[in-house]
Amino acid sequence: YLNFMGLQCYHGSAQHYRLPKERQDAIAAVCAKAAEAKAAVEKAGVKVERITGAGTGSVMLEGSSSIFNEVQAGSYILMDRDYAKNQRDASDLAFEHALFIKTAILSHPSQGRAVVDAGLKASSVDSGMPLVWQRTDANYLKASDEHGVLELTPDSPLKLGDAIMLIPGHCDPTVNLYDEIICVRGDTVEAVWPIAARGALL
């Protein structure tokens, strides 16, 4: 049997509103609706012990409200390109990138193009193409199943065999593509985390 615990009040769209004011307004509306729903449920004689929600893009807003007593942020652990596009204000936490895809240049067909061995099977693109990490001379342009095409600046020094790091556009479905996460600190592999839920449907 099930025991009623509370209300799920997650606002998914607000996680990706770019401006702080947009997120603040959206979550203020969520808090008002959550309070109204709690009052209605408790008026009917059912205790609401928990109001849960929030995400990486708005966790400080729900967490500092007097309405939510549980938050569900998850992407902040790894971060991705899409969340990094959110503008922050002084109250927001500065989460760092911790998820990278290592790929290498397999082909250099022209001065302005290169092909890497990381495509759709390596990175989810539902929230945009990966970001080439810490490089201003390369832009990940498009992906096929096995490969990605880079657009290079005329002075790019990248050549065959060079390795680069990518930040996925969306961390959640990207992690689901792998069996393991290789955990590196500096030049040392400190752990290998199995992704036990990969492919799990239930």
PLM features per residue range, with description:
Residues Y1, K43-G45, G63-S64, H97, ...:
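Solvent-exposed alpha-helices and their adjacent loops that cap or buttress functional pockets
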Residues A29-A32, E36, V46, E96-F100, ...:
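Conserved active-site and cofactor/substrate-binding residues in soluble primary-metabolism enzymes
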Residues Y1-R88:
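Active-site loop/helix belt of alpha/beta enzymes
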Residues N3, H11, L78-M79, K102, ...:
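Generic, ordered loop/turn and secondary-structure boundary motif
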Residues R23-A26, S58-T136:
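Active-site loop ensemble at the mouth of alpha/beta enzyme cores that anchors a bound cofactor
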